[in-house]
Amino acid sequence: MLLSDLSSDQEATGSNSHGGGGGDRMVVGSHGAAHVVLSNLFLPPAAAAAATMLLPAAPVMVRPAAMAAAQEPRAKKKRSLPGNPDPEAEVIALSPRALVATNRFVCEVCNKGFQRDQNLQLHRRGHNLPWKLRHRAAAVSAVTTAAPAPRKRVYVCPEPTCVHHDPARALGDLTGIKKHFSRKHGEKRWRCERCGKRYAVHSDWKAHVKNCGTREYRCDCGILFSRKDSLLTHRAFCDALAEESARLLAAANNSSSITTTTCNNSNISSNNNNNNINSISNSNNLLITSSSSSPPLFLPFSTTPAENPNPNQLLFLQQHQAAHHQLLLPQFQQPPSSPPAYFDHLAFGGGGGVITGSSCNDDNSSIAGDVMVAAGGDSVSFGLTSEGSVTMHAGDVGRRRLTRDFLGVDHDAGEVDELELDELPADLSTTAAACQGCNFAAATTAACCATDFTTGSRQYLGRLPPVNETWSHNF
């Protein structure tokens, strides 16, 4: 299709492909024929420049002032605060009985009550009874005469102690003053059956019952909340309480651990002395420990045996490496003192004794290190084998055993199996006599249950359990 055909069709119909009158340009050819050029691309360069100069200026769009004002952010109108009435308003004080009265206006036909007379008048129309609605005097006076507008009414609370009892803080709505008096000063007569919450205003109760139980917000402590903001407020206090409880518990645990270590270290310092103790040889009840350089022995008595009514205490020997020496307080690193009272109790009161030594002057001694021998009527006996390991024997055959199962590993009798006495080497009885001239001294390693001194590893012979952190933090 030629451009001339397109132009003739548009002239006949009066249409424009671009929808605007100024979109197409009329160009007159050399033969007088009019042509409509849809775009400057169809013209030669000289003609395109001339056509551009002939174009009218583009119209300038001007926004109306109303549209400009509509798009600008409008300042939100603030609601008047409750209790700040118009100074020109009429102040009305109703009695508490009038505020709490319900259904004051009753229909004489069906005995249905209404809170306002206007509602009763509208109800009377259904019974074909005469009814009359009260009109404001302003509506009547506006038609007849130019009377002034009526004053606005505000209501004060009848409770003298209430903040809204002051006319300057009166409420401007009759329904509002009624609900205020019921909520703040009235009886809460409506109770929720789900949560037990009570309300003084029936509409408040209905709104609560509608949503109660539909949404639950549970705290980690188990308390349920129906509102998220209540949960967030509670969680702030709950988390703070949990952190405080955890901090106090950690402090209590640290204090208990320090107290146990201090008590044990006090027993160590009391055992370090340079006095020799006479040995009481008892082949059935011996407590012997040995090491290359013997440490102070841990005898964790809660009280001394003289104060403890149970003379059959289970003695635990704990191991302290050189790395733990800084735990000893300066008060426990004092010059050695006299033997403690419970050594005398073991030696003379229970038919046994304790012998400790730092070095044996006797060349016949087979123990390379310090030796401690404890003997009693019922005690735990240790023995050093020829291979360099320590064995344990508890009590005599036929007597009550002292190796109680405090950790609960033996569910049958509550006690740990004993080692036979004949498993101990025969030269243990001579060890005590060989070490009578030994002195008390500090050491670096003590045996617990059974220790292999050649490899440095612990061996638990029989069914003796390892001591957990309740007894000592070193095991």
Swiss-Prot record:
Function: Transcription activator that acts as a flowering master switch in both long and short days, independently of the circadian clock. Promotes flowering upstream of HD1 by up-regulating FTL1, FTL4, FTL5, FTL6, EHD1, HD3A and RFT1. Seems to repress FTL11 expression. May recognize the consensus motif 5'-TTTGTCGTAAT-3' in target gene promoters.
Motif (Nuclear localization signal 2): 177-184
Induction of expression: Induced by FKF1. Down-regulated by DLF1. During the basic vegetative growth phase (BVP, photoperiod-insensitive phase), suppressed via phytochrome-mediated light signals involving the phytochromobilin synthase HY2.
Zinc fingers (C2H2-type), renumbered ranges: 105-127, 155-185, 190-213
Motif Nuclear localization signal 1: chain residues: 123-130
Taxonomic placement: Eukaryota, Viridiplantae, Streptophyta, Embryophyta, Tracheophyta
Pfam families the record matches: C2CH-3rd_BIRD-IDD, C2CH-4th_BIRD-IDD, C2H2-2nd_BIRD-IDD, zf-met
One term under GO cellular component: nucleus
Recorded name of the encoding gene: EHD2
The protein's name in its UniProt record: Protein EARLY HEADING DATE 2
Residues bound to Zn(2+) 1: 192, 195, 208, 212
Segments forming CCHC-type zinc fingers: 217-240
Chain intervals with Polar residues compositional bias: 1-16
Localization in the cell: Nucleus
The organism of origin for this protein: Oryza sativa subsp. japonica
Statement: the UniProt record of this protein carries the keyword Repeat: yes
PANTHER family: PROTEIN INDETERMINATE-DOMAIN 12, SERINE/THREONINE-PROTEIN KINASE RIO
